[in-house]
UniProtKB/Swiss-Prot annotation:
This is Protein pelota homolog. Belongs to the eukaryotic release factor 1 family. Pelota subfamily. Its cofactor is a divalent metal cation. Keywords: Cytoplasm, Endonuclease, Hydrolase, Metal-binding, Nuclease. It comes from Sulfurisphaera tokodaii (strain DSM 16993 / JCM 10545 / NBRC 100140 / 7). One of its GO terms (molecular function) is endonuclease activity. Its EC number is 3.1.-.-. Signal peptide: none annotated. The gene is pelA. The N-terminal domain has the RNA-binding Sm fold. It harbors the endoribonuclease activity. GO terms for biological process: nonfunctional rRNA decay; nuclear-transcribed mRNA catabolic process, no-go decay; nuclear-transcribed mRNA catabolic process, non-stop decay; ribosome disassembly; RNA surveillance. It comes from the Archaea. PANTHER family: PELOTA (PTHR10853), PROTEIN PELOTA HOMOLOG (PTHR10853:SF0).
Amino acid sequence: MKILEFDDKKGIMKLHIENEDDLWILHIILKKGDRVVAKTTRDVSMGRESRRIPMIIKLQVEYTEFQSFTSRLRIHGIILDAPERFGIKGSHHTINLDIGDEIVIEKDHWNKFEIEKIKRQEEKHLKMLIVLVDFDEYLIALPMKQGIRILAEKSLRTPNKEEENIIEDNAKEVANEVLSYAESLGIEVVLLAGPGPFKEIVSNFLKNIKLYVDSVSSATRSGLNEILKRDIIDQISRDYEISEETKIMEKIMENLAKNTGLVAYGKEEVKKSAEYGAVDKLLVIEDLLSSDEEERMEIEKIMEEVENKNGRVLIVPKDSPIYYEVRNLTGLIALLRFRIN
């Protein structure tokens, strides 16, 4: 996500959507009564026939729909402004927001939690290496905000009958270079891909790093372009975030089992802990942010209190492996820095 403009006084923010997670964040942040401006298409009567016309409209939000692992957010609402000649003001409409689109959001009041969530999403960048390997060549690339940086693009000794260990030696050479970059750049995860079995041999020498293995047609720049066109990088980023949520939940369950007093759950307990500045991590199921307006406002107030006192809020989607555990503990559960009772 990229913030293109933000006018705090007018409550207007313009955003560029870069990935699926951005759409999910907007699904959480957009509330009934907010206004959005975006490009859309609509069927308009033109004499005896109807045509789908592209246009820019301003919509007052009624509700939003988002399905995990899709690339579209549906924003339902009432048209506040549109080209006069079409006569559609006051009509119901749905804006389909996709990756690559821009949207202007206007709110009467931006909560600190909402602004921080968007800023964190803008800054979020998983440190990953893309490593493409084949028996005779390899390529190592670093995805960055400003584009892809090629770190290494090299040939390997061709396997032959006289030198039986060439394949294993080549695999060690690649693995050592990957590990060297991983250490110097603070890499968190490696995506290893290639056209044949050589990637599995290389993976045997990369045991101490988080590794994803995929197939690609070649270990060249065209293979790199092939990988970049897929959804796998977004999926890895999402998996990494889900892994973090899972670790927090494991710590919560450990503390509950030991009765340490370092866990709070339920609205009243968590609210009290937040007011004391005791909340380190807060897990909230997404249902609580799409329930009735009064409850949503209560939950958001707690979330904002946590953020204001340097705690971290993680929203747990329905497809998360810890969703049902969190839901069974009221859907709102906090790991505390210190006991308050």
